[in-house]
Amino acid sequence: KGVILMTELKITAANFENEVLRSDKPVLLDFYADWCGPCRMLSPVLHALAEENSSTLKVGKVNVDEQTELAARFQVSSIPMLVVFKDGKVAAKSVGYRPKAEIAAMMEDAR
């Protein structure tokens, strides 16, 4: 059996500051829910981006049903919602399913 590398971080209220706000790399956060169809469609796209950019980017996932405080803090009203953080600040936002190329372009703009 091979080693499984964690390419996507589970972000919670407890680790948000360290993993996102204090990150030395840009962070792409996916606000999602397990029951959300478009969220499930987006998941493999984000996984691929995380693997391809692991040295320059962090990808985190926030389950809005479990992390209601974070969902409220970032005014998540529709999911999936992607938020890019750079240097502890929101650099870009996107709501709804997006193809990989659009998300990659959003990340490039934030770098």
Label for each model-derived stretch:
Residues K1-L5:
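Short, Lys/Arg-enriched N-terminal segments with co-localized hydrophobic residues
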Residues T7, T12, Y32, K58-G60:
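Conserved Rossmann-like nucleotide-binding pocket used by diverse enzymes
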Residues L9-V27:
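A short beta-strand-turn-helix
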Residues D24-K25, Y32-W35, S78:
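Short pre-active-site segment immediately N-terminal to redox-active cysteine/selenocysteine motifs
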Residues D24-P26, M41-V62, E66:
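Conserved helix-turn-beta segment immediately C-terminal to the redox Cys motif
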Residues F31-V45:
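Conserved redox-active cysteine motifs that mediate thiol-disulfide chemistry
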Residues T68-A72:
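Short conserved loop adjoining the S-adenosyl-L-methionine
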Residues S78, V83-R111:
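Non-catalytic, surface beta->alpha helical segment in thiol-disulfide oxidoreductase systems
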